[in-house]
Amino acid sequence: MTMFSTRSRLRSAAADTFALVVYCFVIGMIIEIVISGMTFQQSLSSRLVSIPVNILIAWPYGLYRDAFIRFARRHAGEHMWARNLADLLAYVSFQSPVYALILWSVGADLEQITTAVASNALVSMAMGVAYGYFLEYCRKLFRVAGYI
């Protein structure tokens, strides 16, 4: 089965969607409540709004991330640091604008949005990389073939 078969694309989209929805719900809620000072209600609203957004952006993000990983492999080989840096850059550059819009849509003020997005970017230095590994794990669970 190649990456471009319908079945492979569906598996890839399902794995990417599952991974992004679960990961962003859990990590986002922790960041919003513990670091950003949002109320539980604001955070829950934000996380519920994020679900359909994450469903829409999950597969495009997976493809975007894969392009970063391929670029890193082409220019730095199989070094773990290059892969981790690619995961970090892909995650922060793709997710930060989306996250800011979600927070704005649920009524977070500019200070909360700035704090949450900046905190998320800082936390992503570890969490973006962790998400990359979680995504790989989900792709294995969904038996996605030839995804990178």
From Swiss-Prot:
GO molecular function: L-amino acid efflux transmembrane transporter activity
Domain of life: Bacteria
Organism of provenance: Yersinia enterocolitica subsp. palearctica serotype O:3 (strain DSM 13030 / CIP 106945 / Y11)
Protein name: L-alanine exporter AlaE
Localization of this protein: Cell inner membrane
UniProt GO BP: amino acid export across plasma membrane
Entry-linked Pfam families: AlaE
Keywords on record: Amino-acid transport, Cell inner membrane, Cell membrane, Membrane, Transmembrane, Transmembrane helix, Transport
